[in-house]
Amino acid sequence: MMNHQSMQNGKQGPLEGIKIVEYGVFHAGPGGSAILGDLGAEIIKIESGFGDPERYWTKIADLDMSTPNGESIMHEVSNRNKKGIHLDIKTEQGKTILHRLVEDADVFLTNLRKNTKQKLGIDYESLKKINPRIIHANVSGFGPEGPMDNLGALTPLDRLFPA
């Protein structure tokens, strides 16, 4: 389990007592919850498979993006203030653990695509059955509804499709 250092340094913030379960990749989702952690929220990051792909971004073109110990600076920045768990939510055991985490969470934050969330059972409709008061925060490239609602996006793409 990862446990990145908090920017709070032991100080309480306005979100102290708020529990956020995050299942996100790259920066959009994880970066948002890192800021909420700066404000005192407890963040539990779920990773599956090989982990968040941002873990492996140690070089972009000729730019070295690694820490002195070889880890991704981007991943470190996006995942400060978090506890982490590796969980395969496609298995019954993984689903059971996920449900336990969501039962008493205040927020579930994700940036996965719509069909992926539905397939994994982490869409709002599925999670509200486990915790009716859950806030389902979703970061998406093209919004929750519309002709491109199931497309993923990285920052360069959003410059092509202004709001």
Q: What kind of feature is each model-predicted range?
A:
Residues M1-A163:
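N-terminal helix-loop segment corresponding to the beta1-alpha1 unit
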